Amino acid sequence: MKKGTYEDQIRIEELEVYAHHGVYPEENEKGQHFYVNATLYTNTHPAGLADDLSLSTNYGEVCQFITEFMQQHTFQLIETVAERTAYEVLQHFPLVQGLDLEIRKPEAPIPLPFGSVSVAIHREWHEAYILSLIHISEPTRP
């Protein structure tokens, strides 16, 4: 995030989701555990002053949303899981201006000892300015 914009964070750590993502058919059929870490960039100041949840992002709702999204969709790549999940969180939670999202896959089919593999991304809203230039010309005279 840019310095001075939404430096407040709501963090979700190790959200466990059982879902069916993977390149191999057995991953899609059997499913496996995924762990999600998310940092939501937002302005918590109004909610903190007023002690009012309606002025903040309800992290319980975000956890439920991520879980349901990951369980209702099947993707081959955890890169896709991360991209689509981040997009949907930004679309559904208007006070979230950006997020860091990590999808961990500790049961990945790797025939070597390992702790986990993961994809971590950062996505945020950007202001866009659209300039419309209309060129009106007079008819040419012969």
Model region roles, listed by residue range:
Residues 1-133, 137:
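N-terminal, polar/charged subdomain of small-to-medium soluble alpha/beta proteins
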Residues 138-142:
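Short "domain-exit" segments at the C-terminal end of structured domains
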